[in-house]
Each structure stands twice: as C-alpha cells, then as structure tokens.
UniProtKB/Swiss-Prot annotation:
<feature type="coiled-coil region">
    <location>
        <begin position="954"/>
        <end position="984"/>
    </location>
</feature>
<keyword id="KW-0175">Coiled coil</keyword>
<comment type="function">
    <text>Catalyzes the attachment of valine to tRNA(Val). As ValRS can inadvertently accommodate and process structurally similar amino acids such as threonine, to avoid such errors, it has a 'posttransfer' editing activity that hydrolyzes mischarged Thr-tRNA(Val) in a tRNA-dependent manner.</text>
</comment>
<dbReference type="InterPro" id="IPR014729">
    <property type="entry name" value="Rossmann-like_a/b/a_fold"/>
</dbReference>
<dbReference type="InterPro" id="IPR009008">
    <property type="entry name" value="Val/Leu/Ile-tRNA-synth_edit"/>
</dbReference>
<keyword id="KW-0547">Nucleotide-binding</keyword>
<feature type="binding site">
    <location>
        <position position="582"/>
    </location>
    <ligand>
        <name>ATP</name>
    </ligand>
</feature>
<dbReference type="InterPro" id="IPR010978">
    <property type="entry name" value="tRNA-bd_arm"/>
</dbReference>
<feature type="short sequence motif" description="'KMSKS' region">
    <location>
        <begin position="579"/>
        <end position="583"/>
    </location>
</feature>
<dbReference type="Pfam" id="PF08264">
    <property type="entry name" value="Anticodon_1"/>
</dbReference>
<dbReference type="Pfam" id="PF00133">
    <property type="entry name" value="tRNA-synt_1"/>
</dbReference>
<dbReference type="InterPro" id="IPR013155">
    <property type="entry name" value="M/V/L/I-tRNA-synth_anticd-bd"/>
</dbReference>
<dbReference type="InterPro" id="IPR019499">
    <property type="entry name" value="Val-tRNA_synth_tRNA-bd"/>
</dbReference>
<dbReference type="GO" id="GO:0004832">
    <property type="term" value="F:valine-tRNA ligase activity"/>
</dbReference>
<keyword id="KW-0067">ATP-binding</keyword>
<dbReference type="InterPro" id="IPR001412">
    <property type="entry name" value="aa-tRNA-synth_I_CS"/>
</dbReference>
<dbReference type="GO" id="GO:0006438">
    <property type="term" value="P:valyl-tRNA aminoacylation"/>
</dbReference>
Length: 984
C-alpha cells in the first residue's frame, strides 16, 4: 500500500515543477529573451562535437563564407537548411559533424583593405608585399569574427572546435601539396590564354566575379573595303559592313567571318579585306558561328579580345593581336602571336594617334576618324550586357596574358563517371544535366590571380626564366639540384580562391596533417551532403569532385567522392522576384529580421557605401514606403521556419516579411499552447492535478486515439521528407500538426473534457498525459527547425513526464513512429466529427450568430454506423460546436424552418425560431434587397439601350449580362429567405 506521505510529497514536488515551468514561460513570447545565452550554453556543453561512438555518421562541410564579410539572406537560407539536417541527424542517432570554416576571399578582402589604407592616405603599391599582408591579417583578426558571430545568431550547430580558415597552416599545406602533385603529374602548366581581365584591379577574374549588366550602348556599323578593288558584293558594293559594340578592338582584327550557308557572301570566302586605320590585310573566312540573320551577316574577328572570336580564331588558325596593356591602354606596339605556342610575339607599330590612349578615348577617336574618312555606315542605339567586375565595377576586358592553368580533361573523366553511375546524386535531379553539360565541354581552368592576398603559387624562377615547382624554396633546390648561388624568385601571383575551396571537404578534415586523428577522415569523409546554390555548381561543386577524386583514395585505391548528395537550392529574391543587391536597395539582413531595426537605421544601412551614390535618394524613398515603421523583431526561429518552409528544392524563393510574421505567430501559438497545457495541470489553487507518466489506452476516447494516430503519422512523414531533402514539406508537416490538429482540435477537445465534471479523474489524468506527451514529442520533432523555442519549452515540459534523459533537447532522441498507434478508422471517425462541427460553425456564420449562443441541432438521415459513431463523440461534438441540444429526426418527423448543411448524406439542421429577431432581420434584408434591385434595374436599362449594345465591345456587353444574371439569382434567394422569415 502506498505511503500517503510519499504521495503528498510527490504531489508537492509536481506542483513545484509546474509552477517553475510556468514561471519560465512568461505570458508573452519574447524571442530575444528566449534566445539570450542559449547558444553559448549549447556550445560550451560540447553538444555540437561528434562523439565517434555511433554506427552511422552524418557530415556536412559549411560552404565557407568570406572571412571579413557579413551574413546575407543566401547565407541565412543555406544555414537554416544545413542546420535542420544536422540537428535532425544528431538527434536521430548519427555521429554528426558540421565542419565550419571561412574563406580568405582573395580579391574581396584585398579590396577592402586597400580602401581602408587609401582612406589613411596609403597606397598598396607604396608598401612591401609583406607589410600589406600583415595589414590584411590585422583586418582579418579585427573583423573576421563578425560572420561567425552571425552564424551563431542563426543557431547553426557547427563544431566550432574544428573551425578552419583557408589560409590556416593546415589548409595552406594542403594547397601546396595539391599544386605540386598536379604539376608533377603534368596537370598544371603555365600558358598564354584569354582571360577576364580587370584593368582597374589588374587581375584575372573568374566568370563568377563578372556581372553582365544590362546597359544602353551603341552599335557601330563600319565599312571594311576589299583589298581587290574589282571585287564587289551581290549589290555592287566594294566593301562589307560589320557591326561592333567595341570599335577600339578593330585595331586587333585578324579576319571577317561569314556563314558558309549565306549565299550573299559565298563568292567572297577566301578573299581579303584591308582594314582601316592599320592597313592590315585580313581574310574573309566561313564559320557556322556567324548568325546569318544578325545585322549584315558579317562579323569582325578579334581573337585576342573576344572569347567567341578566340575560339573561331583557333579553328581557322588566325593570329592573335593584343592591342591593350594591363591598364587597358593601347600599346605603342601591338603584340602579334601567330599561335598560342609562340612565347615571344612580333611587334606591329600602333598608329601614332592611338598609342597610349585609354581604351574609351581610343574608341572615341576611331569613331570620329571613321566618320571623317567615310567608312562609318551608321550608329544605332543598342541594349547590351556590359561585363563589369563584381567588385569595383570596371568594364572587364578579354585579355591575352600568361597565367597558370589546370589541365582538367583527365580530372573530369572520373568526376563525370561518379555522377553518371550514381555515386553522387543531385537533388533535384535536373541539376545533374547542368553538371554533365558543363563537364563534357570543360575548358582548362585558369588558377592564377594577380593579387597579394591569397595562397602564393609555389613556383620559382631563375634568372633565365626557368620554372621550378615545389613546396618551398629549400625543396626546389633539393628537387632540381640547384646550387646555393642560383638566384630564385617566387612567382608573385596567388591562386584562385576556388582552388583552395575545391579541396574543402578533405583539407578541413586534416588530410595534409600526418599527426591528425585518422578517425576524422575515416568517419566523416565522404561527407553526406553538400548544400549549395545552383550558381556555383561549375565553380565549386565540379571542382571539388575532380580534386577529391584525384587526391583522396579508399583503402582499395579507388577514388573517394567528396559528398554523396548535392542538395541544390534556389536563390533568395525579394518579394517581387528581383535579385537582392545593394544597387537595387532591396537587400535584407537576416540579423535585422531577427532583432528588428528602426527605419532611420535601415535607410542609413541601405544607402551608405554605394557604388552609385546617385541611387541613394530613390532607394531611401523606396525603403520608407516599404518599411514605414522599420522592421520588427521576429526572432531566429520564425526566420528559420520561413526559410525551410520556402525550401522547395531547386526553386528560387521570393522572400516576403509577411511570411516571417505568420511564422512568428506560429511560434507564439506553440508558446501559448504550452502555457495552456501547464495551466491545466494545476487546479484553481495552483496545486498539481494528477498526471499519468505512461499511456493507458484503455481509458482513451476518440480524441486521444486520434491525436496519437496523427502524431505517429506525422513522425513518419517528417522522417520521409527529411530523407528526401524536402524541408518545405517537413515545415508543412510540423505546422499542420501543431497548429491545425494539436492546438485547434485536440487542445480544444481536451479542454472540454477537463472541464466536464462527468469525466472520471482517471481519464483526466490520461488526457493531461496525452497533452504533455504529444507536446513534448512535437517539440522534439520541431527542434531541428526551431531550436530556441523548442529548447526553452522542452526544458519545462520534459521533467513532468520524467523524460530528461539528456540535459538538452539538442541531444535528445528524435521521435520514432509507433505504428501500433496509427488507426485509419480512428482518423476517419475524427474527420467525420470535424466535418460535423464545421457544418454547425458554418451555419452559425451564415446566420450571423455569435459564439456565445448555444444552438439546438437536428440530424436527419443518419445511418446506423453514424449513429454509433455519434454516441462515442456526442459530448465532444456538443462542446466544440457549442450545441445546446442534439436531436436525431426519425423518418416522417416534421422538420421546422431551419438553416442546414450536409455531411455526406447526413443533413445537419439548426432551427431558426428563437435564434433571430425576424422583424429586424427582415428590415436588414429589405434594405439589401432594394439596393440589389436598383443595381439590377440599372444594368437592365443599359442592356435595353440599343445604342449601348451595338456600340460597346462584345466582351463588355457579355460582362454586363453576367452581372445581371448574378444579381437576379441573389434577389431570388433573398426573396425566398424573406418569405421564410415571415413564417417564423
């Protein structure tokens, strides 16, 4: 027999626990208070670190953000997805590592530091390389923590104890190792090729660092005369007309091309043109590249200053003539290369008027001379895409220069096979096609940049220009048997940032460190998934696959892939579908959505440090209109839930703050539901009510059976959707269950039973158990997306069920499905009850009866099965539908004047008598009737007017006829309703 003292003590302890729980859940949900200090507690407790004691592993490498950058919405979206996956797998029992790190971001970081120095009156070129690098490291130490602080604010559960930086010693060693081995394998070479050249910053750029900006320009049409004055076109002219948006490049033309199928010019193929200005004689060549329909069908070819012309020039073995220096000024002597194998060019003297001119000054002069000399045909306005440097905004020039390249054909084959045979899966699958198309046409990769900040290329030159490649100078001398007195100079260039990023999955796991814990690579490589945007499939994803498969091998010597799945998400755009950019003034900072920001601060943020200050006034006006009160604080969980709810694989998302507001309300709903559950666990005096600690299905009724069935069905769906990377569906599952099923239905049904004196104490104890059990389970399955809110509430709920096996929900077990609880019959019964309740609520709304009025309800045409079902749920039905009396009509019973609704074949009726004031309702309907009657008569008169009908467009007349028919239908229904009211 139980000791009464022990029972009383247990009750007192429970009361204390519940009161403490309520005190931790204040009346109003305040995300800033909930979040404060929580992340630091998680991090300090080591919850984000792997344990190496699990059978299954899950790992993600964080795409490294710019070390000195700030979080943008793309980062926020990406991090929300990765953290949801990481937290899910950690809770689901996997040995989990989310590997963090930052990128040195060569050109971006160097530009920031140069601007800071220029503000102090210091130019980089006036400093030594070593002194400048020291300044960059100072800047990195000063501002490098900003991005990681912001990642923490997002709740991202990365293992900070393993944080890496692409310029760390370990990663730098990996970069050197890879470069040297590729060079020794004959896969890295130095050669002259056409590159994107930034003349302002004087470095080669990757395609990703070039923005094609829509701009208004001109299309100049020039007459290029035949060398042989006896040759003419079909229409008798002794010249061809070519069009260009870059007249200055005419100085470097080496051919004119036509399409071989173009009959207008077939007789001219193989003839020659004498170029204006230079007097150079160039051939007319035939190539399918030329569009017959564009312009005259004749194209000037400048292989050294246009990527398409470069390829055409290679096909026709045309010489390349470089006319520009590194500053985009016209060379005093143009460099002529018969082919790319020729190291030293011959020189062709530039016409004196052009030597040394800046490119646009040369353009102006050339157009003026063309007009004066009679070879300017015409000038047209032209919409073009200007290639501008992403940072700095300079027009980028295709320029012929010596650079370092990776010969990627050999590396590409295993990377193609790995995707073709399914070792690596793209989600969604269509991105496999994008990857394969690029890989099958892959070009050698330019990996050198003319910068000071970055991984300096491990190559040295002697005084004769011979190249030596090794990990350091000492190894160079040893490897190549060079005497100590041989002078060596290290290459000044640094590697493309994407080179070090291409090693990211394995270099961060200490691949190049012989003293590292081998379990890290063995356990977490290949990584499980790469989460990325489609815009860097070529620049990063493909290169990671190639590099990893070349350098990382399994025990049997087969290549190891970097990741098993590539999850590709869309880009975050504004609410109108526009790309977010500083220049458009539509950028949102995730931290401002979390913490809120005043209007003036937001305006200042959007209009300061703009590349085009003239846009500031327009952006300020736009911002004040869009955010008149600034941005309120929504909290991290609402933002994360918004991101995941929009994460439909592969699609761009249009970000709308109204969505965040809606999910902030969802967080509030969970908070309030939790408080309600706790308050229903104590009596009016605040003493604990009985709460069962285990399930007792024998006393469950339909609501308990239903919510437990729905809970387990939801768990099944969530697991399935996580496995499919459908985080939008995971969010939908969570929202639908918690808001629509738990809060709107089960909590309301439970409330009715707990307030019903006829319900036994035994059942009430089970209802409280189910309320708590379902809530605690829902908190756990929601945690990967809403970590802060769920942790705060779980800490108060779990102890009441003795479920604090762990100190934090972060490492609690993820819910698993109990199939024995799922019942299709139970869910069908509940669906019927919901329809029944909804039908009464609809009638209540149509009759404009307040919720306080309890209604008499009649049921007609009820089947035997429905009658049995009704007997089990009558109390719940009456409580939630606010029904005063429930009567089942027999066949032949008189049916009073009622408002009705159908549930299948069952008719639900609410008698009108006594519920409304017939006189007042008739008066109201009469006014409405008169108004509608006037409208219908006006339209009828219009349609009776022959002038209107004959002159108005047919669609206008038809619209008026449809409107009249609709009004007449409303009048007929209103007349019948008024007749019914007269009979009450």
């Amino acid at each position: 027999m139980s000791n009464p003292n022990n029972i009383e003590s247990s009750k007192t302890n429970l009361t204390t626990s519940i009161q403490a729980a309520l005190s931790q859940l204040e009346n109003a949900y305040n995300p800033s208070e909930v979040e404060a200090g929580m992340y630091q507690g998680w991090e300090d407790s080591g919850y984000f670190q792997p344990t190496f004691d699990k059978d299954e592993s899950f790992s993600i490498a964080l795409p490294p953000p710019n070390v000195t950058g700030s979080l943008h919405m793309g980062h926020g979206f990406n991090n929300a997805i990765m953290d949801a996956l990481t937290r899910y797998h950690r809770m689901d029992g996997d040995n989990t590592l989310w590997q963090p790190g930052t990128d040195h971001a060569g050109i971006a970081t160097q530009m920031v530091v140069e601007r800071r120095l220029e503000a102090e009156g210091i130019k980089r070129r006036d400093m030594s390389r070593e002194d400048f690098i020291d300044k960059v490291w100072e800047w990195k130490e000063e501002s490098g923590g900003n991005i990681t602080r912001q990642i923490r604010r997002l709740g991202s559960s990365v293992d900070w104890s393993r944080e890496r930086f692409t310029m760390d010693d370990g990663l730098s060693n990996a970069v050197k190792e890879v470069f040297v081995r590729l060079f020794d394998d004959g896969l890295i070479y130095r050669g002259k090729r056409l590159v994107n050249w930034d003349p302002k910053f004087q470095t080669a750029l990757s395609d990703l660092e070039v923005e094609n900006v829509d701009e208004k320009g001109s299309l100049w049409h020039f007459r290029y005369h035949f060398t042989d004055t006896d040759i003419t076109t079909q229409d008798g002219k002794n010249y061809l007309v070519v069009a260009t948006t870059r007249p200055e490049t005419s100085l470097g033309d080496t051919a004119v091309a036509v399409n071989p199928k173009d009959e207008r010019y077939a007789h001219l193929i193989g003839k020659t043109i004498t170029l204006p200005i230079t007097g150079r004689i160039v051939p007319i060549v035939a190539d399918d590249y030329v569009d017959i329909e564009f312009g005259t069908g004749c194209v000037k070819i400048t292989p050294a200053h246009d990527f398409n012309d470069y390829e055409l020039g290679r096909r026709h073995e045309l010489p390349l003539i470089n006319i520009l220096d590194a500053h985009a000024h016209i060379l005093p002597a143009m460099e002529v290369y018969p082919d790319l194998q020729t190291r030293e060019p011959t020189l062709e003297t530039t016409p004196a008027d052009y030597a040394g001119l800046e490119r646009f000054a040369a353009r102006k002069l050339l157009v003026e001379q063309a007009g004066e000399q009679g070879w300017l045909e015409k000038i047209e306005d032209y919409a073009l895409k200007a290639p501008r440097a992403e940072r700095g905004g300079a027009i980028v020039e295709p320029w012929l220069t010596d650079q370092w390249y990776v010969a990627v054909k050999e590396l590409a084959q295993p990377a193609i096979a790995a995707v073709e045979d399914g070792q690596i899966e793209f989600v969604p699958a269509q991105y496999k096609n994008m990857y394969m198309a690029w890989m099958n046409g892959i070009q050698d990769w330019c990996i050198s940049r003319q910068l000071w900040w970055g991984h300096r290329i491990p190559a040295w030159y002697d005084e004769e220009g011979s190249i030596y490649v090794a990990r350091d100078e000492a190894e160079v001398r040893s490897k190549y048997n060079l005497a100590a007195d041989v002078k060596l100079r290290q290459d000044d260039d640094v590697l493309d940032t994407w080179f070090s990023s291409g090693l990211w999955t394995f270099s961060t796991l200490d691949w190049a460190d012989v003293n590292a814990d081998p379990r890290v690579m063995e356990t977490f490589h290949p990584t499980s998934v790469l989460v990325t945007g489609f815009d860097i499939i070529f620049f990063w994803v493909a290169r990671m696959i190639m590099m990893t498969m070349h350098f990382v091998k399994n025990e049997d010597g087969t290549p190891q892939i970097p990741f098993k799945t590539v999850y590709v998400h869309g880009l975050v755009r504004d609410g109108n579908g526009q790309k977010m950019s500083k220049s458009k003034g539509n950028v949102l900072d995730p931290i401002d959505i979390i913490d809120g920001i005043e209007l003036e601060a937001l305006v200042e943020k959007r209009t300061s440090n703009m590349m085009n200050p003239k846009d500031a006034a327009k952006i300020e006006k736009q911002t004040r209109k869009e955010f008149p009160e600034g941005i309120p604080a929504f909290g991290t969980d609402a933002l994360r839930f918004t991101f995941t709810s929009l994460a439909s694989t592969g699609r761009d998302i249009n970000f709308d703050l109204k969505r965040v507001e809606g999910y902030r309300n969802f967080c509030n709903k969970i908070w309030n539901a939790s408080r309600f559950v706790l308050m229903n666990c104590v009596d009016k005096e605040g003493n604990a009510q009985a709460i069962d600690q285990t399930a007792n299905a024998d006393v469950w009724e339909l609501p308990e059976k239903w919510i437990m069935s729905r809970l387990n069905s939801t768990i099944t769906n969530i697991h399935q959707h996580f496995d499919q990377y459908r985080l939008d569906m995971v969010s939908h599952d969570i929202y639908e269950f918690i808001w629509n099923e738990y809060c709107d239905w089960y909590v309301e049904l439970a409330k009715a039973s707990l307030n019903d004196d006829s319900v036994s104490d035994e059942r009430k104890a089970q209802i409280r158990y189910v309320l708590l059990h379902v809530l605690e389970t829902a908190l756990r399955f929601s945690h990967p997306i809403m970590p802060y809110l769920t942790e705060q509430i779980w800490q108060t709920i779990a102890p009441l069920l003795n479920r604090k096996e762990t100190d934090s929900i972060v490492i609690a077990a993820y819910p698993q499905t109990d199939n024995s609880q799922i019942s299709e019959q139970t869910e069908a019964d509940m669906a019927w009850l919901q329809e029944l309740i909804a039908s009464v609520r609809n009638i209540r709304g149509e009759m404009k009866l307040g919720n306080a009025v309890r209604l008499p309800v009649l049921l007609q045409n009820i089947s035997a099965a429905e009658d049995t079902r009704l007997s089990r749920i009558a109390n719940q039905f009456k409580a939630l539908a606010k029904v005063e009396s429930l009567t089942i009509l027999k066949e032949g019973d008189e049916v009073p004047l009622s408002s009705s609704s159908m549930v299948g074949q069952l008719r639900v009726l609410v008698p009108m008598k006594g519920l409304i004031d017939p006189t007042a309702e008739l008066a109201r309907l009469g006014k409405s009737y008169d108004k509608l009657k006037g409208q219908s008569e006006g339209i009828a008169r219009k349609l009776g007017n022959e002038g209107f009908v004959s002159k108005a467009p047919v669609e206008v007349v038809d619209a008026e006829k449809a409107k009249l028919a609709e009004l007449e239908g409303q009048l007929t229904a209103m007349t019948a309703q008024m007749e019914e009211l007269k009979n009450l």
